[in-house]
Amino acid sequence: MTAEGPSPPARWHRRLPGLWAAALLLLGLPRLSVRADGKFFVLESQNGSQGLQLEAARLSCKSRGAHLASADELRRVVQDCSFAVCTTGWLADGTLGTTVCSKGSGEQQIMRAVDVRIESNPVPGGTYSALCIKDEEKPCGDPPSFPHTILQGRTGLEMGDELLYVCAPGHIMGHRETAFTLLCNSCGEWYGLVQACGKDEAEAHIDYEDNFPDDRSVSFRELMEDSRTEADEDRGQGDSSEEAPKQDRLVSISVGRENIARDKVFVPTTGLPGAGSSVPADSPGSRLLQKHLFWFPAEAFHKPGLEKEVDDDTKKQFSAGDNHSGVKLVPGEPETKVIYGNTDGPSGPFVGKNDSKAGDPVVSSSDESWLDGYPVTEGAWRKTEAEEEEDGDRGDGSVGLDENVLVTPDQPILVEVKKPKSSTLTPSEGMTHSSVLPSQMLDVEALALRPVNASETEGIGDGDLTKYQSTLPWRFITEESPMATLSYELTSSTLEILTVNTVKQTPNHIPSTIMATTQPPVETTVPEIQDSFPYLLSEDFFGQEGPGPGASEELHPTLESCVGDGCPGLSRGPVIATIVTVLCLLLLLAGVGMVWGYRKCQHKSSVYKLNVGQRQARHYHQQIEMEKV
């Protein structure tokens, strides 16, 4: 009697556990998360708390057309690719590979894998991620095409293979090169230095990093024209043409090669924003690092379309030679670009054309002399006619709260002596400026500065305020005035020096606040170059004749100085001055409040429209007037 084999139902029952395990594995695969980086990718559990066993990792990679990476493949990926996944996963031989990450140097500190650790004895039954590499016939895709370039040969389309390109007949490469190669790296990308083929010696270097898709070509005609124009401009600039070729180098990272060059590269960004402009970049992973782009003052450069209004209060002076904020100015033609960059970019100025895009700041150079970042001209201390006309439109004579105080170098400080109850300062043609006399103790009533001959003085009208610039000596008339009598204690030993910073443009505005009479006396000197300011009052001035040629000038006697016990007491002077100043400030604040309230009352009503829908808006409009209380 022969023994019968197991019946078909029995065989199905024996296979059920294996089928259930396979079904559970297939159901679990979609819940895996994938972190891909080109040809290399990582499979791990969805929640990150549980990994995969070795067999499950193999099946997971195989289901996605890949296989577990070997130790050599993992090292090659970390070395050549910009791999930013830090994890521990299964390798093909059952060992564990761990990618060690570190933050890169520079402004953008990005985590990047820099090393690999191999663990040959993993914990039995442990679960880890799966380190997979794709199994494709063309990991880098079809060979790219370039203008006037012929693909002469190739070793293959797998990882590590190279493509050899030569120029078409009648075209040559720059730097006397005859061919260039592209490498299919472990990241699944064609990588290398692309030489542009042209009809002359003009050259262009391109770091090929996905700049050219596989299905299209990019024209280099505009790039060649821009390069020729920039080369001509560089020859006229001197040493600018010698610095550019030194920077046309590239970081070459080749699988299986030991020589690795690390340097800067010029990347013409054809097909990207700002076509035709030279962009400094680090390769691989070139990034635009140009920052801190500023304009020079608009008064020095008058170029259509590039002028920019700059407020005098917000102008900054930049000093050349600073490592962090150096301004590289290329002197020469007005058509020269000057790009202000930091130390991250290549050294030397970048010279380009005027038709650049992407918002490159462009200024034209000037032959004028420069002092502290501003052009020095003959009229540096005077207003332009346009500014005087704008100031003339304000001719109501009032002094605004936001007006600047008149500060001129080496000019005497003028003290306004007014009635104690006055709240605002309203200049007029008859305004008198009393100057503090640097002599002994004087009982000053009022001293008025008036020109000798009105016809011999020139005045510049600024509203109701008149600024006199005289070339003749002034005479001083002592007159009685109903103003409050002020006492000053002035000694030659307590004079202080007032340092006045040089300003570019001095607005012809009078001070908006009255200077306190208790201010310490100051001593200034009049420049000998330009006699455009009133003379200082001193004892030597009253003891001699004026230097001017006027014959009708008279020298009136000055006030007698008091000596001994006859001098009036000065104990109440500072107190009275303080009270007067406080009252003036309070009245000024009250006036500001009244003006603000008046303006607010002018806009007391607003009209609003009611949106009632698209259909009803044709036949019905409703207005609501709301009055502010």
Curated annotation (Swiss-Prot):
Residues 138-199 form the Sushi domain. SUPFAM superfamilies: C-type lectin-like, Complement control module/SCR domain. Residues 225-252, 344-403 are annotated as: Disordered. Its main location: membrane. Disulfide bonds join C61-C132, C140-C184, C167-C197. Gene3D superfamilies: Complement Module, domain 1, Mannose-Binding Protein A, subunit A. Residues 596-629 are cytoplasmic. Residues 36-574 are extracellular. The keyword Signal applies. It comes from the Eukaryota. Residues 225-249 have a biased composition (Basic and acidic residues). This is Sushi domain-containing protein 5. The gene is SUSD5.
